[in-house]
């Protein structure tokens, strides 16, 4: 595998100041502080189960609410993946995974196609997980999809506990991203598309 599939992104607005480092071919090492504890917990899942090395620091207007920071971290992380993958030569492109967590079961299927689309099927009954607004789960994935150019389908198959459902979702997402971004040696570094390119339309 290439040792150069790394990227650093810095994104600063009037609402947030975010820096991200990613190593696609990492070991699941993470240093994460967004100021939103539950989001940190989910980002650790992406690193741990995707085997991506992640360093994420975010300062945002969380004194208002978590929306801007949550969304902007999704945007910046999507940009970091895009930059690290480059032309996406040799990758599997597609990924899928079923992740259980106790009674919850979530399926994620995705395509690193350059065509941003989100189909979101989580049914979360609790309005909050700790202090985290559960509506922000969808907002995070919308932001990530639009900035990374992936097609992402999230389907909840079973589940009652909102924490279990969301954590299963992030675990399934991380394993799907791992599968999609891994190198297919049979491709010999070619782009996995009949049109010869994968870019955000």
From Swiss-Prot:
GO terms for molecular function: imidazoleglycerol-phosphate dehydratase activity. HAMAP family: HisB. Belongs to the imidazoleglycerol-phosphate dehydratase family. It is found in: Cytoplasm. It comes from Prochlorococcus marinus (strain MIT 9515). This is Imidazoleglycerol-phosphate dehydratase. Pathway: Amino-acid biosynthesis; L-histidine biosynthesis; L-histidine from 5-phospho-alpha-D-ribose 1-diphosphate: step 6/9. It comes from the Bacteria. The keyword Lyase applies. It holds the Pfam family IGPD. It catalyses: D-erythro-1-(imidazol-4-yl)glycerol 3-phosphate = 3-(imidazol-4-yl)-2-oxopropyl phosphate + H2O. The keyword Cytoplasm applies. GO terms for biological process: L-histidine biosynthetic process.
